[in-house]
């Protein structure tokens, strides 16, 4: 009898354990009909314990199946695949966007006509530049000279986001101040963007000038850069709610006609209520103070790009980055972020003279307190900007002939003629080395 009661208690324990497991796993209990249950070795007449047993009586329910069974158990291999609830939905969305992008892969707009182009029709000429995200080469496609930017894919989500942003933003933009995209090719391991070819970026020009001991960017060239860059940034904000976030000398390009255009939208962002949120996007030496401060780093607006443009222009006209650089980049960024330390100013420049308007304009761009720094539309009303805006009428300083900004183009040609190509690879002291 004791053995019978022990087995009864064991069955009760199994029932409780089974119920606990089903509740914990969120499963629905499967109940077996009485005729489907397999009997154990206990005879039916011993289903109940004697009243003399020391254990309390428990009436076993008639329709609860066993968790265990005398039958041989089957072992199911453990699956290592994530359940649907644990899938990386962000990466799934990126992969879906790539699949959608394949639909337009190979369709290029050449001389105003959309053409389906085979990748084998890309004939590479030479390397124009390289960076952490890929390479840019000159090439011909159906006799059209263009630049081909190749970006390599991997499983990193930030890498995929950067490629998709660059493709998406370049495809949607139509501005004379932004490098034109003709289309793209998508492959399993890379993406190629075919775009308008430019002659040189400001960073390479600055290196040529420095090592050839030429005069740095003159004020009228800086004015043309300011006008073109702010026009491009304002277009991005007003038409597409985009903030560039990576303004620096290497992303401002010249062509032979003196036109200036922005490029590289891999870390650009779409703004919500005119605010951006990403904390890490951008090149730290050119980041605005508010983006380097913990308290304000969660949100910022286009005025951060105004600061980046100010630092860039200061560097172009003086030949030097305006903050001390050393092995500890943290120290440099701390100086930038410290609102109690003065901002750089051309007023302190003694080697060259600049107009009061230019000095005042750059001082506005380099206000450390973001609340005192103007946005694009405010800067576009400043007299220095108007001096280089063709729409300003009599205030405009240049006369464009046949689409060519003569003075800027002449200056550019002289720099190329008087400097050496190999100087583009040489660094400049106290200047950030960025890609």
Swiss-Prot record:
InterPro entries in the record: Kinase-like_dom_sf (IPR011009), Prot_kinase_dom (IPR000719), Ser/Thr_kinase_AS (IPR008271)
Give the matching SMART domains. S_TKc
What EC class is this?
Answer: transferase
Q: Which GO terms describe its molecular function?
A: ATP binding; exonuclease activity; JUN kinase kinase activity; MAP kinase kinase activity; metal ion binding; protein serine kinase activity; protein serine/threonine kinase activity; protein tyrosine kinase activity
- What is the annotated tissue distribution of the protein whose record heads this document? Expressed in most neurons, including nerve ring, head ganglions, dorsal and ventral nerve cords and tail ganglions.
* Chain sites annotated for binding ATP: 128-136, 149
- Keyword annotations for this protein? ATP-binding, Cell projection, Cytoplasm, Kinase, Magnesium, Metal-binding, Nucleotide-binding, Serine/threonine-protein kinase, Stress response, Transferase, Tyrosine-protein kinase
Active-site residues, Swiss-Prot/TrEMBL: 246
Region annotated Disordered, chain positions:
35-90
The protein's job, in short, is: Dual specificity protein kinase which acts as an essential component of the JNK signal transduction pathway. May phosphorylate jnk-1. Plays a role in coordinating locomotion via D-type GABAergic motoneurons and in regulating synaptic vesicle transport downstream of adapter protein unc-16 and probably by activating jnk-1. Positively regulates lifespan. Upon environmental stress such as heat stress regulates daf-16 nuclear translocation probably by activating jnk-1. Regulates germline cell apoptosis in response to heavy metals such as Cu(2+) and to arsenite.
The UniProt similarity line reads: Belongs to the protein kinase superfamily. STE Ser/Thr protein kinase family. MAP kinase kinase subfamily.
Name assigned to this protein:
Dual specificity mitogen-activated protein kinase kinase jkk-1
Q: Which organism is it from?
A: Caenorhabditis elegans
């Amino acid at each position: 009898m004791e053995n019978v009661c022990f087995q009864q208690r064991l069955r009760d324990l199994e029932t409780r354990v089974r119920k606990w497991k089903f509740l914990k796993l969120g499963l629905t209990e499967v109940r077996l009909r009485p005729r489907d249950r397999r009997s154990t070795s206990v005879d039916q007449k011993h289903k109940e314990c004697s009243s003399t047993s020391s254990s309390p009586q428990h009436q076993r329910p008639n329709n609860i199946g066993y968790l265990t069974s005398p039958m041989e158990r089957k072992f199911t291999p453990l699956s290592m695949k994530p359940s649907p609830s644990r899938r990386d939905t962000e990466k799934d969305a990126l992969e879906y966007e790539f699949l959608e992008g394949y639909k337009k892969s190979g369709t290029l707009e050449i001389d105003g006509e959309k053409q389906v182009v085979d990748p084998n029709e890309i004939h590479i000429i030479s390397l124009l530049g390289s960076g952490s995200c890929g390479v840019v080469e000159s090439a011909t496609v159906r006799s059209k000279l263009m630049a081909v930017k190749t970006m390599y894919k991997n499983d990193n989500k930030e890498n995929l986001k950067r490629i998709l942003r660059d493709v998406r933003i370049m495809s949607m933009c139509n501005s004379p101040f932004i490098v034109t995209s003709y289309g793209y090719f998508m492959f399993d391991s890379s993406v190629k963007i075919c775009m308008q070819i430019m002659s040189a970026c400001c960073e390479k020009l600055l290196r040529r000038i420095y090592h050839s001991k030429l005069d740095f960017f003159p004020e009228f060239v800086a004015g043309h850069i300011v006008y073109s860059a702010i026009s491009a940034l304002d277009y991005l904000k007003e038409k597409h709610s985009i903030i560039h976030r990576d303004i620096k000398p290497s992303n401002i390009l010249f062509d032979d006609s003196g036109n200036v255009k922005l490029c590289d939208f891999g870390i650009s962002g779409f703004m919500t209520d005119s605010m951006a949120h990403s904390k890490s996007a951008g090149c730290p030496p050119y980041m605005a103070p508010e983006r380097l401060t913990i308290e304000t780093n969660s949100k910022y607006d286009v005025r951060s790009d105004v600061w980046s443009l100010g630092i860039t222009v200061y560097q172009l006209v003086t030949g030097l980055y305006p903050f001390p650089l050393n092995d500890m980049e943290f120290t440099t960024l701390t100086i930038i972020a410290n609102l109690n330390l003065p901002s750089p100013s051309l007023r302190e420049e003694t080697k060259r003279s600049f107009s009061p308007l230019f000095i005042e304009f750059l001082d506005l761009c380099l206000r450390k307190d973001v609340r005192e720094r103007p946005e694009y539309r405010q800067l576009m009303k400043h007299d220095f900007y108007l001096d280089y805006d063709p729409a300003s009428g009599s205030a405009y300083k240049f006369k464009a002939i046949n689409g060519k900004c003569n003075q800027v183009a002449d200056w550019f040609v002289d720099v190329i003629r008087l400097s050496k190509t190999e100087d583009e690879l040489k660094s400049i002291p106290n200047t950030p080395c960025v890609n």
